[in-house]
C-alpha cells in the first residue's frame, strides 16, 4: 500500500519526502510552493504517526493550521505549516502537510499532544468547517455560539434567514 501512495513518477520528490520514504511513512509529494517549501499530502489515518516522526525529525514548531473547502460538496482540506526551529538557523526548514477528508465524516487525529499550539487552531477549524479532530482534549466551538447549527465556512452552507442576536458581555 505504501508504494501506491508514494511512488508517483510525475511528482517532484524533496528531501523530506525521501526521508519519509526511507522510513516507510506513506505520503504523496505535491511539489513546492513559490518559496520552495515542500508540500506533502498525508492520509488521515497516517497523520498522527507522521506528525510524531516529523517532530522527532526536528519540526518542533507548528506555525499555522488552517482548513479550506475544496469544492461545494467535495473534500475538506486541513493544512499544517511546520517549521524546524534551531539556533543559528537563518533559513529554517519548513514543510506544508495537507490532509483531505470527506465532508460526510470529516475526522483527523489531533496533533495537540505533539504541538500544543494546535489547540485553538484545530478548534477554529472544527467550529468553521466541522472537521472533528479525534483525541483533542477540548474540541468545542470557539467562535460561534454553542447553539449554532452548521459549519459557516463550508461552500455548501445555507445561511439561515433568522439570526438571534445576543448582547455582548
From Swiss-Prot:
Membrane topology field: Peripheral membrane protein
Keyword Plastid among UniProt keywords: yes
Protein name, as recorded: NAD(P)H-quinone oxidoreductase subunit J, chloroplastic
Gene: ndhJ
Assembly information from the UniProt record: NDH is composed of at least 16 different subunits, 5 of which are encoded in the nucleus.
Source organism of this protein record: Anthoceros angustus (Hornwort)
Catalysis: reaction(s): a plastoquinone + NADH + (n+1) H(+)(in) = a plastoquinol + NAD(+) + n H(+)(out); a plastoquinone + NADPH + (n+1) H(+)(in) = a plastoquinol + NADP(+) + n H(+)(out)
Pfam families: Complex1_30kDa (PF00329)
Disulfide bonds: none
Amino acid at each position: 500500500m505504501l508504494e501506491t501512495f508514494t511512488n508517483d513518477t510525475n511528482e517532484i520528490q524533496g528531501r523530506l519526502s525521501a526521508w519519509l520514504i526511507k522510513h516507510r511513512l506513506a505520503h504523496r509529494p505535491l511539489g513546492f510552493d513559490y518559496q520552495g517549501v515542500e508540500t506533502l499530502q498525508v492520509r488521515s489515518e497516517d497523520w498522527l504517526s507522521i506528525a510524531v516522526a516529523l517532530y522527532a525529525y526536528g519540526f518542533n514548531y507548528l506555525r499555522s493550521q488552517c482548513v479550506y473547502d475544496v469544492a461545494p460538496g467535495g473534500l475538506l482540506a486541513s493544512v499544517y505549516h511546520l517549521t524546524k526551529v534551531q539556533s543559528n538557523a537563518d533559513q529554517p526548514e519548513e514543510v506544508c502537510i495537507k490532509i483531505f477528508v470527506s465532508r460526510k465524516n470529516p475526522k483527523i487525529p489531533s496533533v495537540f499532544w505533539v504541538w500544543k499550539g494546535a489547540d485553538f487552531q484545530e478548534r477554529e477549524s472544527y467550529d468553521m468547517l466541522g472537521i472533528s479532530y479525534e483525541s483533542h482534549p477540548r474540541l468545542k466551538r470557539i467562535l460561534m455560539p454553542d447553539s449554532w447549527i452548521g459549519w459557516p465556512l463550508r461552500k455548501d452552507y445555507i445561511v439561515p434567514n433568522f439570526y438571534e442576536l445576543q448582547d455582548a458581555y
